[in-house]
C-alpha cells in the first residue's frame, strides 16, 4: 500500500513514514497537486527512465514496491535531537543544513563515524552547545524529525560543509579564520 501526504508549499512529501524532498516545494497547478516525477517514482518504488532527446519519461511498474521507512533508529534519534536543539525556529532548509553538517562529519575521517559519536565528540572540546546545556535530551520538534529523515534520505543543501554557527549568538572566530564560507541559511552560516 502507498500512503502519500503532500501539503501545498511544503518542501517534502510523506510516504509510508518516509520524508522525500521536493526541491521547489509541493505545488498546485490548475487546482491539482503537482509533484516531480522523480519524487513520485521514489514514493511508489517505480523505475523512472528519461529520454532527453524526445523530452519523454517512462515509469516502469515491474517489481514496484512502495517506499517504506527504514532509518537507523539511533541515527534518527540523535540527528533529530541535535537538529532541534541547534536550529529550533529555523526554516526547514536551515534544519536540513544542520543535519547535513552532522552527516558530513560522520563521513569525514576527522570525526567519529556515527551520528551519536559526532554529537558527543569532545576531541577539541564540546562541539555543540546543546550537549553542554542538556537541551540535546529534549524531545525534538516535529519539523526536526522531518529534517532528519530528509538528511538520511540524502537531501543535501550545504555541500561538504563541516561547520556552522549563528553570528547572532557567537563570534565564530575559529570557523571564520580556519574554514571557507559556503552559504547562509536562516540564522546560520555554513563553512567547508
Region locations from a protein language model:
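Primary recognition of N-terminal secretory signal peptides and signal-anchoring hydrophobic helices
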Residues: 1-80
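Bacterial extracytoplasmic/cell-wall-associated proteins, especially those involved in peptidoglycan
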Residues: 66-192
Amino acid at each position: 500500500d502507498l500512503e502519500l501526504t503532500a501539503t501545498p508549499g511544503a518542501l517534502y512529501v510523506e510516504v509510508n513514514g518516509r520524508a522525500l524532498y521536493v526541491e521547489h516545494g509541493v505545488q498546485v497547478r490548475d487546482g491539482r497537486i503537482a509533484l516531480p516525477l522523480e519524487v513520485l517514482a521514489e514514493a511508489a518504488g517505480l523505475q523512472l527512465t528519461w529520454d532527453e532527446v524526445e523530452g519523454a519519461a517512462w515509469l516502469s511498474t515491474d517489481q514496484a514496491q512502495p517506499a517504506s521507512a527504514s532509518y537507523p533508529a539511533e541515527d534518527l534519534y540523535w540527528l533529530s535531537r541535535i537538529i532541534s536543539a541547534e536550529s529550533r525556529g529555523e526554516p526547514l532548509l536551515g534544519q536540513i543544513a544542520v543535519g547535513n553538517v552532522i552527516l558530513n562529519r560522520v563521513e569525514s575521517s576527522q570525526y567519529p563515524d556515527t551520528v551519536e559519536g559526532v554529537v558527543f565528540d569532545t576531541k577539541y572540546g564540546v562541539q555543540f552547545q546543546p550537549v553542554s546545556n542538556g537541551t540535546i535530551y529534549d524531545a525534538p520538534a516535529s519539523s526536526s524529525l522531518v529534517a532528519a529523515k530528509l538528511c538520511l534520505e540524502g537531501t543535501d543543501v550545504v555541500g561538504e560543509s563541516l561547520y556552522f554557527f549563528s553570528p547572532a549568538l557567537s563570534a565564530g572566530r575559529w570557523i571564520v579564520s580556519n574554514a571557507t564560507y559556503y552559504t547562509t541559511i536562516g540564522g546560520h552560516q555554513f563553512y567547508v
